[in-house]
Amino acid sequence: MSLEGKQYYFVAYDYDTSAIFAIPITDLRDETIIIAFTEVFEELVEKGYTPTFNVTDNQATTPIKAFLKKKNCHWKFVEPSNHRVNAAERAIQTFNNHFISGFSSTDTNWLLQLWDQLTRQAVTTLNILRKLRMDPLQISIRTAEWTQI
């Protein structure tokens, strides 16, 4: 547990931008997940990439359905054991590997309870390294936008 009470990461993946999002959360209640989900959705809209389709596992299905319906976004829910269909599963692995490698390079005297303070740096460096699936001419624009997160 972090000093701010965070215990988990909410990790999301956007296919078009190939961006991975990670938000430290306190618990796995529906309300907490929908707040993190909304934060990711709003950030994508703010950057000009409005999601139109969402694939997710069955966690917090009712609130996510209601949210996506309000945003005119289609959705598909996959069973939790089917990791091949959900591209976010690979994004979770990628984020975990990147975060752990960065975490292991911290000072040996650094407080482990501050792990959630590394999130912004980890997400920024991870997304700068990823390739864009959209128009290659937008790469420099995307890099400038995502580094301002």
Locate the predicted segments by residue:
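Charged, gly/pro-enriched flexible loop segments at helix/strand junctions
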Residues: 104-149
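Retroviral integrase
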Residues: 1-97, 132-149
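A polyampholytic, Gly/Pro-enriched intrinsically disordered region
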Residues: 94-106
